[in-house]
A protein has these predicted regions:
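Acidic-and-aromatic substrate-binding clefts and catalytic sites of carbohydrate-active enzymes
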Residues: 200-206, 231-234
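Binuclear metal-ion centers of metallo-dependent hydrolases, dominated by the metallo-beta-lactamase
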Residues: 72-113, 211-275
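Short, solvent-exposed loop/turn and secondary-structure capping segments
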Residues: 44-46, 133, 206-207
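Conserved strand-to-helix beginnings and helix N-cap segments that scaffold or border functional pockets
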Residues: 181-182, 206-207, 235-237
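Core dinuclear metal-dependent hydrolase active-site scaffold
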Residues: 1-24, 106-186, 264-275
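Active-site metal-binding motif and surrounding structural segment of the metallo-beta-lactamase
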Residues: 6-9, 14-82, 89, 96-100, ...
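Divalent metal-coordination and catalytic microenvironments
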Residues: 1, 12, 35, 43, ...
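Active-site metal-binding loops of divalent metal-dependent hydrolases
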Residues: 13-15, 36, 85, 125-126, ...
Length: 275
């Protein structure tokens, strides 16, 4: 996400960013992590663009135990903003990746940090936040794995970003339906653009996410994410997919993200280019 003042923020890179050398990144000022599950923290990444198939990408470059996120932050000398108890864990990972632990900044619920001109707040999410054994020291990781456990890093979070042009973006992270989506995200922060997960089973599904948008957050527009499917073909949404079901259920303009396309929004949450 890029502010008009040039501040650039990366959110939950997971598997999808090809390390700090990914040419799509450019300058990165801060990295956000909603929770420490592998698909957000990143145990591996693709060696080249589009490696593998859309439904089965190839992640040949291993990033454990440090994580793709920590490697990117260290390589870009970017801040990491994190809530709960994730900051101490991430500080160790950044140090191991060659960075400075002081790059990691804690942002608890109710606070707002600044990165350049962008305000960054954490908001509650309803999910889990266990970090997998592959990210831990071998002895501890093996012990947890043998007992079917993960290391808990406290509550997961979502984010609200306040940009200098007036745009206020809600990044849901992985979550179910929460009262805070109304009380905190809509009433207090007045988010006018939302990026919401629609993956179902583990998080809100298409109809639940549409309810969150239409009845709780009430933004001017929404971007569906984390659908856990091959959602598009030839730039068009595939009929019958979760993405298709969400697009039909929600009542505000919904913009599907496509590789290689940049979307631009004005201060009211209206898409003005790339949608």
């Amino acid at each position: 996400l890029e502010d008009p003042d040039g501040t650039r923020i990366l959110y939950d890179p997971g598997f999808t960013v090809r390390g700090a050398g990914d040419p799509r990144l450019g300058k990165i000022d801060a990295v956000l992590l909603s929770h420490a599950h592998g698909d957000h923290l990143g145990p591996a990444h693709q060696a080249t663009a589009n490696a593998g198939a859309c439904g089965k990408p190839a992640f040949a470059v291993k990033d454990v135990p440090n994580s793709n996120l920590a490697t990117i932050a260290a390589g870009k000398q970017a801040k990491i903003l994190a809530g709960s108890d994730m900051h101490l864990f991430l500080a160790g990972k950044v140090k191991a990746a060659g960075g400075d632990p002081k790059q990691v900044q804690l942002v608890r619920f109710g606070a707002m940090a600044k990165v350049g001109g962008v305000g960054v707040a954490t908001v509650p999410a309803v999910h889990t936040n266990g970090v997998g054994p592959e990210f831990l020291d071998k002895g501890l990781g093996d012990m947890l794995r043998a007992n079917g456990l993960t290391a808990n890093l406290g509550p997961p979070v979502g984010y609200v970003l306040r940009f200098t042009n007036g745009l206020v973006v809600y990044l849901s992270g992985d979550t179910g339906i929460t009262a805070e989506q109304d009380v905190v995200v809509r009433r207090h922060y007045k988010a006018n653009l939302a990026v919401i997960n629609i993956g179902d089973v583990f998080t809100t599904g298409p109809t639940e996410a549409a309810y969150v948008i239409d009845e709780l957050v009430k933004p001017a527009a929404v971007i569906p994410s984390h659908a856990n499917e091959v959602a598009t073909q030839g730039g068009k949404v595939i009929p019958g997919t979760r993405t298709d079901r969400f697009m039909k259920a929600v009542h505000v303009p919904a913009h599907v993200p496509l590789s290689g396309r940049t979307m631009q929004f004005d201060g009211s949450g209206r898409c003005v280019a790339g949608c």
